């Protein structure tokens, strides 16, 4: 009688949500304002107070409408739990040192005899679950590869998510030049390249960007014909959600796709012949290590700081390496075994060398910028 009266009162008041929590063999019932549920820390303290366990670290879970037992450990999933309560919010509490993390997941409340029974009727003699290091408290993606189906195999489009943290994007860019092989011959064009990655930065942690990758687009805008300062401003303006299209210097890590059919999400039709002119492009990598003395470093504030430039002991001539090799059956670029080095016009010395396949040269001109 009392239970029916309490249920009728709770259903009659639209702004009140009834909560039924279980800890061990104890059940507690209380009400919350649905429109003002508060924060998770407040709800966590309320559960400790109701069950009289103020100094016990517990793991909180709730039953959703799909029969899943899901954790509550931050404000987002706490508000999600409140929104799905119809009309009762069922809470399950476990001690962290005795928690069964395998009980969380899809259809866990439907499989009552195996999963949920371990939570409702804990047995000290049952087999202990495997040790779990921790459960994620607040996790978000940091990077992703997008538009795989519409880009050539030699290109990669990377999205970096910053989420307002103080962690920098963490890569340096510089201007340089690359040589494109077109039906009209060799064409040398300026380009923007990644010169180095900051250790511990966002770009290095993703593993999707590397030194000497050529930057082709920034958030859908081509960088061709733009200066280094303009590209830097574009990246700073979109640093919160940066989408950068690059031509990786190491083409071996690219996804190999079938040129005729698309077998799965990782294999898709090669559209390089449809949407892009057929051409082979060779990038140039630095013959010598970059000097930190002539770098322009730009942080998130966007204010450049010029580092004093040291006078070089001698002037080194840049050499342009042209690699022309096609792999049979693939529309891409592969480094040959022997490569001739063509001197840049205006250089004093002409030098021909044989380089290993993994070694490339890059023309080093311009300043270097970090985001």
Swiss-Prot record:
InterPro entries in the record: PAR6_homolog, PB1-like, PB1_dom, PB1_Par6, PDZ, PDZ_sf
Domain notes: The pseudo-CRIB domain together with the PDZ domain is required for the interaction with Rho small GTPases. The PDZ domain mediates the interaction with PALS1.
GO CC annotations, alphabetized: apical part of cell; apical plasma membrane; bicellular tight junction; cell cortex; cytosol; nucleus; plasma membrane; protein-containing complex
Location within or outside the cell: Cytoplasm; Cell membrane; Cell junction, Tight junction
Lineage: Eukaryota, Metazoa, Chordata, Craniata, Vertebrata
Family: Belongs to the PAR6 family.
Domain PDZ as annotated: residue spans: 157-250
Full protein name: Partitioning defective 6 homolog beta
An annotated GO BP: cell division
Regions that span the bilayer: none
Residue span, PB1 domain: 16-96
Alphabetized SUPFAM superfamilies for the sequence: CAD & PB1 domains, PDZ domain-like
Known role: Adapter protein involved in asymmetrical cell division and cell polarization processes. Probably involved in formation of epithelial tight junctions. Association with PARD3 may prevent the interaction of PARD3 with F11R/JAM1, thereby preventing tight junction assembly. The PARD6-PARD3 complex links GTP-bound Rho small GTPases to atypical protein kinase C proteins.
Compositional bias (Basic and acidic residues): 352-363
Alphabetical UniProt keywords: Cell cycle, Cell division, Cell junction, Cell membrane, Cytoplasm, Membrane, Phosphoprotein, Tight junction
Superkingdom field: Eukaryota
Post-translational modification Phosphoserine, affected residues: 10-11
Biased composition (Polar residues): 326-340
Chain spans, region Disordered: 253-273, 326-371
PROSITE patterns hit by this protein: PB1, PDZ
Location of region: Interaction with PARD3 and CDC42: 126-253
Subunit-level organization: Interacts with PARD3. Interacts with GTP-bound forms of CDC42, RHOQ/TC10 and RAC1. Interacts with the N-terminal part of PRKCI and PRKCZ. Part of a complex with PARD3, CDC42 or RAC1 and PRKCI or PRKCZ. Part of a complex with LLGL1 and PRKCI. Interacts with ALS2CR19. Interacts with ECT2. Interacts with PALS1.
Tissue expression summary: Expressed in pancreas and in both adult and fetal kidney. Weakly expressed in placenta and lung. Not expressed in other tissues.
Source organism (scientific name): Mus musculus (Mouse)
Every Pseudo-CRIB domain range: 133-150
